[in-house]
């Protein structure tokens, strides 16, 4: 029901002339509650993202400029440190998150540099949410003027919730990238 209300807000914004798409350097950031997550499930989520983010970027046709700056792939230093140390506490997970990316100096600052990743755990430690920064609305076409799309937003939210649930239910997850010879097949079999 919350998604229905959010979709209606998007429709109202679109009709009022609001604009959002990658050409305007606008991304769609989805925050989901971190409730029920543990350091282990957050490590699972990290590994799930690391193994599928290239596939997601291709399937979603993400803007390369955004990937290079505002929604980077999982930091390899973080990934290696996380899977080596396997923290058992949230504070231990936070230490790995910030220290592995050399962003330990301003953990409580809103614009901490660690936040600019597709999967952002800075939001977890400052807001209690897990943020997915990888989405964007499609550029306007076919007579549409602004790119906002309620159905697209709904599918983004549902994907984030599914990834979160997958991480909670998995006994473990590998960071090894999935095959990408046939991206459409890989995406279908994964989801």
Please place each PLM-identified region on the residue numbering.
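C-terminal accessory/tail domains of diverse enzymes
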Residues: 1-22, 35-190
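Short glycine-rich or small-residue beta-strand-to-loop segments that form or flank ligand, phosphate
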Residues: 29-33
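Short, conserved phosphate-binding/catalytic loop or strand-edge motifs used
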Residues: 24-28
């Amino acid at each position: 029901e919350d998604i229905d209300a959010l979709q209606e807000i998007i429709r109202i914004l679109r009709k009022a002339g609001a604009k959002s798409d990658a050409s305007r350097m606008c991304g769609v950031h989805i925050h989901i509650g971190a409730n029920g997550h543990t350091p282990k499930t957050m490590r699972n989520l990290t590994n799930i993202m690391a193994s599928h983010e290239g596939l997601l970027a291709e399937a979603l046709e993400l803007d390369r400029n955004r990937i290079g700056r505002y929604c980077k792939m999982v930091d390899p230093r973080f990934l290696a440190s996380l899977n080596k140390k396997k923290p058992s506490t949230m504070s231990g997970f936070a230490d790995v998150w910030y220290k592995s990316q050399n962003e330990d100096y301003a953990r409580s600052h809103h614009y901490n540099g660690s936040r600019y990743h597709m999967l952002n755990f800075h939001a977890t430690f400052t807001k209690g949410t897990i943020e997915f920064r990888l989405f964007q609305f499609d550029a306007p076409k076919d007579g549409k003027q602004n790119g906002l799309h309620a159905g697209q937003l709904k599918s983004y939210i549902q994907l984030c919730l599914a990834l979160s649930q997958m991480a909670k239910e998995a006994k473990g997850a590998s960071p090894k990238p999935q095959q990408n010879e046939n991206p459409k097949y890989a995406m279908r079999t994964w989801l």
